[in-house]
Swiss-Prot record:
Residue ranges of the region described as Disordered: 1-88, 360-403, 418-438
Protein name as it appears in the record: Transposon Ty2-DR1 Gag polyprotein
Alphabetical GO biological process terms: viral translational frameshifting
Subunit structure: Homotrimer.
Pfam families from the UniProt entry: TYA
Record text about domains: The C-terminal RNA-binding region of CA is sufficient for all its nucleocapsid-like chaperone activities.
């Protein structure tokens, strides 16, 4: 009876995987399910009775035929060799494009949970085939790498890698992220990954491989706990938890903004104005710097701006320092207006200076030449020169000679007036005065 009942319930027993489990060796030419219940041990009979009372699982057709029956208990899966990443070979950019894995996207074969934090640095497994761009962090010498096995299409980095690369420090607060990311970027460059890091314009030299992507992701999450990241970084990682390069690209852009802020502060503190440029240009320059700082949430008060401007004034604008020294309520617009007023006054004075000098020079030229003088070289045949055309030294000599001659010979000339007239009448000669000698 018992064997007949077992044969009638054989389909159900075959469908239940646990009903046929034994620890004995079964001949390969005999189906273990065909063994009669009388040959089974007592504990097997009890398990048969318990399992026969359970609900039937899928039919016989759902169980594959297996001549060597194996226990269907779930096998324990061994842990991955590389921590939370699966072991993969080196993926070239061509293979990445062929597998529809685009740059900056989350790869489908990267099996890691959503941004898990790790207190320690990620140590690669020695059995994992790491590429040569990842230097060892231990003091032991790295294993030699066979360059012949490297794929020819993999672009090699040009930077030199040292034996040891110091890892970045762990992020301690959200406010220190901008400082921490500088050390992290330097760490990647020292790891020979500088050609896949975005530059100031957001450009990269080459596409990263899967192993490089996994390495960057793992090191980033190891040293930057998620709860200490800024809000804008969390928003990027919530959309794509592995998009670390976008975070680095925006971080570089923010660093450029911070550098511009520093440059603006330096330019504002070193303002100088002496009137060599127009007052409008100076006002536009200062207003642009202040507006740029305001866009970066840095407000510059009018009092501070006026003090920095007054410190750099020189020349005719320097007296404004004393005027504003006692003022408590300084207005930047009022200071610009006074600078403009002084600049306009100086401009008018500079325009009038050339015309005054021109009139003065013309007056000098007119006073030196008499308008009644004529060119005696052309009109007179005896080539007599006028007193105005003679040099000053000749004039002085002639005047001195004539005065002396007149004093000595004045009486003699008066006495010989009759004789001179007689000669003049006879010979038609005229005596020239001594002053007319050449």
């Amino acid at each position: 009876m018992e064997s007949q009942q077992l044969s009638q319930n054989s389909p159900n027993l075959h469908g239940s995987a646990y009903a046929s489990v034994t620890s004995k060796e079964v001949p390969s030419n005999q189906d273990p399910l065909a063994v009669s219940a009388s040959n089974l041990p007592e504990f097997d009979r009890d398990s048969t009775k318990v399992n026969s009372q359970q609900e039937t699982t899928p039919g016989t057709s759902a169980v594959p035929e297996n001549h060597h029956h194996v226990s269907p208990q779930p096998a324990s899966v061994p842990p991955p060799q590389n921590g939370q990443y699966q072991q993969h070979g080196m993926m070239t950019p061509n293979k990445a494009m062929a597998s529809n894995w685009a740059h900056y996207q989350q790869p489908s074969m990267m099996t890691c949970s959503h941004y898990q934090t790790s207190p320690a640095y990620y140590q690669p497994d020695p059995h994992y085939p790491l590429p040569q761009y990842i230097p060892p962090l231990s003091t032991s010498s790295p294993d030699p790498i066979d360059l012949k096995n490297q794929h020819s299409e993999i672009p090699q980095a040009k930077t030199k890698v040292g034996n040891n690369v110091l890892p970045p420090h762990t992020l301690t607060s959200e406010e220190n992220f901008s400082t921490w990311v500088k050390f992290y970027i330097r760490f990647l460059k020292n790891s020979n990954l500088g050609d896949i890091i975005p530059n100031d314009q957001g450009e990269i030299k080459r596409q990263m491989t899967y192993e490089e992507h996994a390495y960057i992701y793992n090191t980033f999450q190891a040293f930057a706990p998620f709860h200490l990241l800024p809000t804008w970084v969390k928003q990027i990682l919530e959309i794509n938890y592995a998009d670390i390069l976008t975070v680095l690209c925006k971080s570089v852009s923010k660093m450029q903004t911070n550098n511009q802020e520093l440059k603006d502060w330096i330019a504002l503190a070193n303002l100088e104005y002496d009137g060599s440029t127009s007052a409008d240009t100076f006002e536009i320059t200062v207003s642009t710097i202040i507006q740029r700082l305001k866009e970066n949430n840095i407000n510059v008060s009018d009092r501070l701006a006026c003090q920095l401007i007054l410190k750099g004034l020189s020349g005719d604008f320097k007296y404004l320092r004393n005027q504003y020294r006692t003022k408590t309520n300084m207005k930047l617009s009022q200071l610009f207006a006074e600078i403009q007023l002084i600049y306009d006054e100086n401009k008018i004075m500079n325009l009038n200076k050339p015309s005054q000098y021109k009139q003065h020079s013309e007056y000098k030229n007119v006073s030196r030449t008499s308008p009644n003088t004529t060119n005696t070289k052309v009109t007179t045949r005896n080539y007599q020169r006028t007193n105005s055309s003679k040099p000053r030294a000749a004039k002085a000599h002639n005047i001195a000679t004539s005065s002396k001659f007149s004093r000595v010979n004045n009486d003699h000339i008066n006495e010989s007036t009759v004789s001179s007239q007689y000669l003049s009448d006879d010979n038609e000669l005229s005596l020239r005065p001594a002053t007319e000698r050449i």
